[in-house]
Amino acid sequence: MKISRLGEAPDYRFSLANERTFLAWIRTALGFLAAGVGLDQLAPDFATPVIRELLALLLCLFSGGLAMYGYLRWLRNEKAMRLKEDLPYTNSLLIISLILMVVAVIVMGLVLYAG
């Protein structure tokens, strides 16, 4: 079933705010994708090739996951608004924050190791 046929249309302000939030997730995903590609292509002396490629792959995979998460979150919020339900709570933000923290620690370790 198409989302536009579900329930009744929410106030446009809320629907557009939901869309802006989705686009923010996409921008963030594109940033991680650019970081992964940049690390692989523009930093050949950063750590060992295996570690550099593994970290670049991790950043690119995280980018794809964020893009999908952004869409699924948009969809859940849109359904909830159309059905006049409470917006769903998510624990995923904690998981995303922890993954980002791990990547940051790895990068800091590699920078200190390479320097």
UniProtKB/Swiss-Prot annotation:
Organism field: Escherichia coli (strain K12)
Lineage: Bacteria, Pseudomonadati, Pseudomonadota, Gammaproteobacteria, Enterobacterales
Family to which the UniProt record says this protein belongs: To M.tuberculosis Rv2272.
Cytoplasmic side: 1-30, 75-92
UniProt keyword Magnesium, yes or no: no
Record topological domains on the Periplasmic side: 52-53, 114-115
InterPro entries noted in UniProt: DUF202 (IPR003807), IM_YidH-like (IPR052053)
Transmembrane intervals: 31-51, 54-74, 93-113
PANTHER family given in the database record: DUF202 DOMAIN-CONTAINING PROTEIN (PTHR34187:SF2), FGR18P (PTHR34187)
GO biological process, one term: response to oxidative stress
Stated name of the protein: Inner membrane protein YidH
Keywords: Cell inner membrane, Cell membrane, Membrane, Transmembrane, Transmembrane helix
Subcellular location: Cell inner membrane
Pfam family, one: DUF202
Membrane topology: Multi-pass membrane protein
Any single Gene Ontology cellular-component annotation: plasma membrane
